[in-house]
């Protein structure tokens, strides 16, 4: 079975200097089937990513059953698969100021080559959920070494509360001027009526030049060097009838380099039928960084 769905948006964006029109439309192909023994399988990709879907760069393919779910392609890393990101602000996500994305190392947030498919396994039994993900450590379908990523995560849900722990690691090839990286994540998610709260704390080591790029600093590139870092954040959103209001704040602190605080606030109004009015503002405390904002209409088909 093949189904078509999609989304679209139109509105205005403020980039810190000027207002610009902004619009987008996308079509999603979703394919699914079931074997005689009851195994479910399928795939999905966006129309504009059809070329990348042929090589696993974009889109995903899955097989699921009583053993869990196996997914390959542009899949999430284990931690993100269980914990997700902070509340998304604005109809364009406003991620050019840091955004709501938790700084995971692996999966579709990965620092490895974009044409390197990820394998993700997830399994749930009662209140427990586990996930594991990895790449094959090669560039595309070649024998050229690439960074090898691995991640594991587990979560426990009791009532309206979820707590979880994740670990991610990237092993760089010997020929690369990039240090090995790793990160441990703690996450907590809660629901109080119509209000959702999510918090996380992450601690580990980043490649020095990757860390410097976050602050628009010139790479050193003299040798592969790791620096300690930590990150933490909180988001809250609440729904009142057709209106949802939410925001986030998160901090990235890198030893010997700098620290930055990202924050955003937004609201949406559900018009019904798959349409909504959405707007938001976002900023950070980096030098020469101005507030960005957007306001527009989003559609789901």
Curated annotation (Swiss-Prot):
Membrane-topology annotation of the record: Multi-pass membrane protein
GO cellular component term of the entry, any: cell outer membrane
Principal location listed in the UniProt entry: membrane
Protein's UniProt keywords contain Plastid: no
Alphabetized Pfam families for the sequence: Porin_4 (PF13609)
Cystine pairings recorded for this chain: none
Cellular localisation: Cell outer membrane
Superkingdom field: Bacteria
Any GO BP annotation: monoatomic ion transport
GO-annotated molecular function: porin activity
Keywords from the named record: Cell outer membrane, Ion transport, Membrane, Porin, Transmembrane, Transmembrane beta strand, Transport
Keyword Membrane: yes
Domain topic, free-text comment: The monomer consists of a 16-stranded antiparallel beta-pleated sheet barrel (171 residues), three short alpha-helices (18 residues) and 13 hydrogen-bonded reverse turns (26 residues).
Function per UniProt: Forms channels that allow the passive diffusion of small hydrophilic solutes up to an exclusion limit of about 0.6 kDa.
Subunit structure and binding partners: Homotrimer.
Name this protein carries in UniProt: Porin
Organism annotation: Rhodobacter capsulatus
